[in-house]
């Protein structure tokens, strides 16, 4: 996690270099995010790096990791060749995954579900989901797109066309044209 209280770019670089020196094969990087419902939202830590510094940390991580033969395969994940997380890729490819344990989430048969966060409740009814939602075809399509955008390779339009029986470029022509017109 980067963007910690009082963390400077040089501190983050040193931490990253130390991690690399351990001969790791995979690393996930996440910027510190303080949720509005947590203790720190009401009592914020002092000296958090600003957004620009956090962006610099992220960009520096990409530079350092790629220089050390890590592939940036997903927005927050880097791996040496053949060490990409199969679990992560399964998730970002919007495939089935099962949630086992307290507060675990899963996705099966077009249904998202999560288990109770209460340990006693989960132990007494481990197969009963706390909540579930059957996704509509449109919701499934939207999830396929936004999850795919997390991967550096992006989305596979041909796969989406087959899976959802659509013409992606036709269906989203107006949105695509809008963003093309921005000329980033």
Regions found by a protein language model. Name each.
Residues 1-166:
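C-terminal scaffold of the Radical SAM
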Residues 66, 180-183:
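Alpha-helix C-terminal capping/helix-coil junction sites
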Residues 165-181:
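Short amphipathic alpha-helical interaction segments
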